[in-house]
Amino acid sequence: MKVLRNRKDWKNLNTKLKSGRIVVLDNLLNDDCLFLLRNRILNATKVNDVYKGYKGIDHWSDSLSIVIANDLRKKLPALDPFVRAWSFIYEHNVDGVPLHADPSTHNLNIWVTPDKCVKDKRKNGLEIYKLLPPRNWTRSEWNGNSLKVQKLIKKTKIKPSKYKYKYNRGILFNGAYFHRTADVSMKEGHENKRISYTMLFGRQLEK
């Protein structure tokens, strides 16, 4: 199954990735792949995690995630081996995922709900702070204590890189950078719910 759209800038994107830059991948996946990613959580009868305002399904080794990961690593050799993936589906008007870091060398966050479903176009995006957790922090601090992260960011005075929501847009970045989902604002109706698909590549922060 072919999952990636044709593009001519893979070599340039891989160079950016190797240099540590945040890479934006618009029009990343083909229509069939997007349909599968979106509908398998829209129609899910069971979820793995329930949070305040959103739910998650884990994709540790499902065939579709593996195909996407393998194709991406062929195009972007700078990517480390695939670790895991998950999907989040949000209620229509809620807070986004709070500030945290992930134990990966790269995160790929892809948005799979069409733009026509968005209510407030100023919301639903992603904020990334080019700041790594202090070495003495534990997982419960860098992945479960957003207030402590906020204090660190305030102390360092670092500003976020902000990325607007766009259907079929992928954001590829150092997963250990602190990041958060912007507040969510989508139109009413189950089919309009904001769905994100996240892939983790490589490992860091945890031994």
What are these regions (language model features)?
Residues 2-96:
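Non-heme Fe(II)/2-oxoglutarate
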